[in-house]
C-alpha cells in the first residue's frame, strides 16, 4: 500500500496537533512531507524530530534560523523554509497528495488556493478560505479535480450524513435544509449587562472543545458559527434560507440534515477534532482516531434552543453577508479577525468586536471579487478601516 503524502499547514495549532496524532496511529498509511508552524519553533522542532518531514516552514528568517539551530542540535535533516511563498510551495509540491489546511485566518488562503490549482486532496480546516473566496476557491477546485473534504466538525458531520452521491443540489436528493449545531459558547446564559466586562481569559475558555484563542473568541461571539454558515453555503451549494442554526450546549450532535420526508439525520460523537480528521484522512475507510466511544448512559440530556441575534449579533451579520454576496463575506472576516486580535490584546471590549464588524460592513466595498489579488486588496482595506475604528474606541 502506497502511503498518502501529506503537507500539514498549521501543524503547531490544535488542528495540526490532532492531525499528527491521527497520522501517528497509522504510519503505514501516511507520510509527512512538510510541516508549517508559523512562529512556534520549539513545538515544530519536536514535530520534525518525530515525523521527519522533508520541509518545515516558519514565518520569517529569524524563526527559520532558530528552527535550523534546534534541528541541527537534534540531528534532524529537515530543510527549513520561511515566508508566504514557502507555504504555497509545500502545498503544491508534486510529491504531495493531500494538504491539511489549518492555518488560522485569511493568511491560509493563498496556500489553500495553490493546492486547489494543483488538484490536491484538500482537508479544509481553514474556514476563512471559503468565507473570503468561496466562489473562486470552489471553481478552482472543480476545474482542477481537487477534492475538498471538510474538517470542521459541523461540516464534516453534514458531509457524513449527506447521500454519498450528493451532487451539490439539495432538491435532487430530497433535502429540505442543513442544520448547523452550536454550543453557544461560554456566555450562553451570562447576563447581557455584564458583556462589557468579559475578559479575554474568560472568552477563550470554551466549555466543550479544545481550540486556539482566536476561534474560542469566535465561538463566544458566535462569529464562528456565522463563518461556518458561509462555509456551508459554498461547500454544499446551499442557499441561506436552507441553512439553520440551533444551539446545542452539549456538543454531542455535530450537525444534521433535514429531509423532505420528515427524517432528520445527525452525526453524533464526543467533541474531539480527531474524529472528523480521521474520517477525512481515511476515506473511504473508517480508521482509528484515538477518540473514546460515546457513552449514552452518561449523557444526562441533549438540549436545543434557537439562537438570539440580540446576544449574538455576529451570527446575524453572517446571514446578511451571504445574501449580500460579493465582497461582503471577505469584509466580515477581515473586520472580525482584526477586532478579535484587538480584544485579545486588551485594546477593546468584548462588545466592541460586533461594533467593529458592523462599522466595516457599513462602508463602501467592491462587489466583484473574481481573483485572489482583488480579494486580498479588499481584505487589507477592511483591516485598515477596522484598525482606524478601533482607534476611536480606546
From Swiss-Prot:
The Enzyme Commission number assigned here is 1.1.1.267
Cofactors needed by this protein, per the record, are:
Mg(2+); Mn(2+)
Q: SUPFAM superfamilies annotated for this entry?
A: 1-deoxy-D-xylulose-5-phosphate reductoisomerase, C-terminal domain, Glyceraldehyde-3-phosphate dehydrogenase-like, C-terminal domain, NAD(P)-binding Rossmann-fold domains
Where is Mn(2+) annotated to bind?
A: 152, 154, 228
Q: In which pathway does it act?
A: Isoprenoid biosynthesis; isopentenyl diphosphate biosynthesis via DXP pathway; isopentenyl diphosphate from 1-deoxy-D-xylulose 5-phosphate: step 1/6
Q: Which UniProt keywords apply?
A: Isoprene biosynthesis, Manganese, Metal-binding, NADP, Oxidoreductase
BP term (GO), one: isopentenyl diphosphate biosynthetic process, methylerythritol 4-phosphate pathway involved in terpenoid biosynthetic process
Q: Which residues bind 1-deoxy-D-xylulose 5-phosphate?
A: 127, 153-154, 183, 206, 219, 224-225, 228
Instruction: Please give one Pfam family short name.
Output: DXP_reductoisom
- Name the residues that bind NADPH: 12-15, 39-40, 126, 128, 212
Catalysed reaction equations from the record:
2-C-methyl-D-erythritol 4-phosphate + NADP(+) = 1-deoxy-D-xylulose 5-phosphate + NADPH + H(+)
The question of whether Lipoprotein is a record keyword is answered with no
Top EC group: oxidoreductase
Superkingdom classification of source = Bacteria
Molecular function GO terms recorded = 1-deoxy-D-xylulose-5-phosphate reductoisomerase activity; manganese ion binding; NADPH binding
Instruction: Quote the HAMAP family the UniProt record gives.
Output: DXP_reductoisom
UniProt record similarity statement: Belongs to the DXR family.
Per the entry, what this protein does is:
Catalyzes the NADPH-dependent rearrangement and reduction of 1-deoxy-D-xylulose-5-phosphate (DXP) to 2-C-methyl-D-erythritol 4-phosphate (MEP).
Query: Under what name is this protein listed?
Result: 1-deoxy-D-xylulose 5-phosphate reductoisomerase
- Protein's organism: Neisseria gonorrhoeae (strain ATCC 700825 / FA 1090)
Amino acid at each position: 500500500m502506497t502511503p498518502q503524502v501529506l503537507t500539514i499547514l498549521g501543524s503547531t495549532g490544535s488542528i495540526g496537533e490532532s492531525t499528527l496524532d491521527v497520522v501517528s496511529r497509522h504510519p503505514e498509511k501516511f507520510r509527512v512531507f512538510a510541516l508549517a508552524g508559523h512562529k512556534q519553533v520549539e513545538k515544530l522542532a519536536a514535530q520534525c524530530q518525530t515525523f521527519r518531514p522533508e520541509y518545515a516552514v516558519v514565518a520569517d528568517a529569524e524563526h527559520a534560523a532558530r528552527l535550523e539551530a534546534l534541528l541541527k542540535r537534534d540531528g534532524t535533516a529537515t530543510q527549513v523554509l520561511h515566508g508566504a511563498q514557502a507555504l504555497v510551495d509545500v502545498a503544491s509540491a508534486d510529491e504531495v497528495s493531500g494538504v491539511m489546511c489549518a492555518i488560522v485566518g485569511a493568511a491560509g488562503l493563498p496556500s489553500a488556493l495553490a493546492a486547489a490549482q494543483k488538484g490536491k486532496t484538500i482537508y479544509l480546516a481553514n474556514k476563512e478560505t471559503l468565507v473570503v473566496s468561496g466562489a473562486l476557491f470552489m471553481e478552482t477546485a472543480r476545474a482542477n479535480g481537487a477534492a475538498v473534504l471538510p474538517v470542521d466538525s459541523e461540516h464534516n458531520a453534514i458531509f457524513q450524513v449527506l447521500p454519498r452521491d450528493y451532487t451539490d443540489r439539495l432538491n435532487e436528493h430530497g433535502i429540505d435544509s442543513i442544520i448547523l449545531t452550536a454550543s453557544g459558547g461560554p456566555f450562553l446564559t451570562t447576563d447581557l449587562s455584564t458583556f462589557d466586562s468579559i475578559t479575554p481569559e474568560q472568552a477563550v475558555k470554551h466549555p466543550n472543545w479544545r481550540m486556539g484563542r482566536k476561534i474560542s473568541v469566535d465561538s463566544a461571539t458566535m462569529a464562528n458559527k456565522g463563518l461556518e454558515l458561509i462555509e456551508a453555503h459554498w461547500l454544499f451549494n446551499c442557499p441561506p434560507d436552507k441553512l439553520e442554526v440551533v444551539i446545542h450546549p452539549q456538543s454531542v450532535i455535530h450537525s444534521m440534515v433535514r429531509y423532505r420526508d420528515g427524517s432528520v439525520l445527525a452525526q453524533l460523537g464526543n467533541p474531539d477534532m480527531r474524529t472528523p480528521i480521521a474520517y477525512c484522512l481515511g476515506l473511504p475507510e473508517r480508521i482509528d482516531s484515538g477518540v473514546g466511544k460515546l457513552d449514552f448512559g452518561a449523557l444526562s440530556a441533549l438540549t436545543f434552543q434557537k439562537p438570539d441575534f440580540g446576544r449574538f449579533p455576529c451570527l446575524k451579520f453572517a446571514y446578511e453577508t451571504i445574501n449580500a454576496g460579493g465582497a461582503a463575506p471577505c469584509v466580515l472576516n477581515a473586520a472580525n479577525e482584526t477586532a478579535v486580535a484587538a480584544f485579545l490584546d486588551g485594546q477593546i471590549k468584548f462588545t466592541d468586536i460586533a461594533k467593529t464588524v458592523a462599522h466595516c460592513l457599513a462602508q463602501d466595498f467592491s462587489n466583484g471579487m473574481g481573483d485572489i489579488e482583488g480579494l486580498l486588496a479588499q481584505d487589507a482595506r477592511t483591516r485598515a478601516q477596522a484598525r482606524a475604528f478601533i482607534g476611536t474606541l480606546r
